[in-house]
Structures are given as C-alpha cells and as structure tokens.
C-alpha cells in the first residue's frame, strides 16, 4: 500500500504538519498492513472486532472516527493545556489516533469470502 493510498483511506494523515512524523506514521501503518496480508481492497473489509460478528463498522471507519474525535477534542481542550503551560502536540495526537489500533492488522487474519 502506498502513502497516497493511505492518505486516501485516512485523509487525517494530512493533518500531521510534521512531515517526518507523518512519514513514520504512514510507514508503521503500511508495515502492519503488509505483515498482516492486507491490501487496498481487503483492508476496507477488515473488521473492527471479532467479538461482534455482524458489526456494521469496519476497522477503517473506526480509525477514521476515533481520529476525528481526537482532533475535535484537541481543538476544544488545547486552550487549557496552553493556559497551564502543558506541552501538547496536535501532530502527536493525530498520529496516535491513526495508529491506535494498527495491531489488529497483524492480529486478525485476512480471509477471502
């Protein structure tokens, strides 16, 4: 999977201003997908959980939603961190949200149906 394909799946990668961090996050996701045997087509069918067999949400949708929620929460909470001189990085929040569940790509076996 290419960086362009990852950015199409997850437009939130563009929210990471630090190019080096963005590349590292993309590489981590790409490696997890490769090691798990997921390609462009199959990753769209990756389940978010194995415990709920009819779950209507895919892994990709889940990661997008969690990342969007983290971006929104950061926007609301950033002022409190700044007021209290707590260092915080939006880029790290976005990268962490995008990568929070990449382990599933290696834990779940891709099975053609």
Regions found by a protein language model. Give the residues of each.
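Acidic/His-rich, divalent-metal-binding segments that scaffold phosphate/diphosphate chemistry
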Residues: 1-113
């Amino acid at each position: 999977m290419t960086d362009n394909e990852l950015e199409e799946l997850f437009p939130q990668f563009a929210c990471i201003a630090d190019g080096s961090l963005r590349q590292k996050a993309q590489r981590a996701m790409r490696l997890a997908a490769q090691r798990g045997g997921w390609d462009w087509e199959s990753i769209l069918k990756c389940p978010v959980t194995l415990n709920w067999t009819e779950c209507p949400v895919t892994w990709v949708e889940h990661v997008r939603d969690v990342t969007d929620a983290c971006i929104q929460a950061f926007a609301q909470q950033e002022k409190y961190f700044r007021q209290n001189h707590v260092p915080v990085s939006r880029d790290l929040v976005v990268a962490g949200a995008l990568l929070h569940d990449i382990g599933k790509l290696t834990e779940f076996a891709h099975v053609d149906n």
